[in-house]
Regions:
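Flexible, compositionally biased loop and terminal segments
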Residues: 1-180
Length: 180
């Protein structure tokens, strides 16, 4: 049986350790991770994968040293500004997920612009998780259900999915956590 998964999710972990082991700047490790993610997206599309989720910055990453967080967000800032060509050239959809409302205004605008500029593309959908945490998504989902006035006695897996960050995207069939 050689079925291609519809949805692959990758927890992008180990870029910093890779750079430390090579005795180079950590931000170079993160840049290398982005280049690898781009290659994964291209190859995923070539073999027929429809959805790719990249966990890029977790809610817990805020606990890293301030200089590292600032460097990462400068990298994200540049990425969202420069990569619209990457998404356009490949026909990819950029779909951001996470607590985006907690990001600074400039970052939210760039994320929104990239999403809007790619929403009609027909290729691979790349869900990029920024300021994301699984527990936080559960809390946000429950809050949305509560705001909708739905009786919690009706709560089931399908209802949770309907109010999740990716209600129309199938769950990942393959989850990968990279390491050094």
């Amino acid at each position: 049986m050689n079925e291609i998964p519809n949805h692959i999710a990758i927890i992008m972990d180990g870029n910093r350790r890779w750079a430390e082991n090579k005795k180079i700047n950590k931000i170079i490790g993160h840049k290398k991770g982005i280049e690898i993610a781009k290659n994964i997206a291209i190859e995923s599309h070539k073999i027929g994968i429809k959805n790719l989720t990249l966990y890029a910055f977790s809610f817990q990453n805020w606990n890293r040293p301030k200089i590292e967080v600032e460097s990462l967000f400068k990298l994200f800032n540049d990425l969202f500004e420069d990569k619209s060509k990457f998404f356009k050239d490949n026909g990819f959809v950029f779909n951001p997920i996470g607590r985006l409302d907690e990001l600074n205004n400039l970052m939210r605008k760039k994320i929104s612009r990239l999403h809007e500029n790619t929403i009609d593309n027909k290729g691979l959908t790349i869900n990029v998780a920024i300021n994301y945490g699984g527990k936080e998504e559960i809390v946000d989902t429950i809050k949305k259900i509560s705001c909708a006035g739905i009786d919690f006695n009706l709560l089931d897996v399908d209802l949770l999915k309907k109010f999740s960050y990716l209600p129309k995207t199938p769950d990942p069939e393959l989850m990968i956590r990279t390491r050094r």
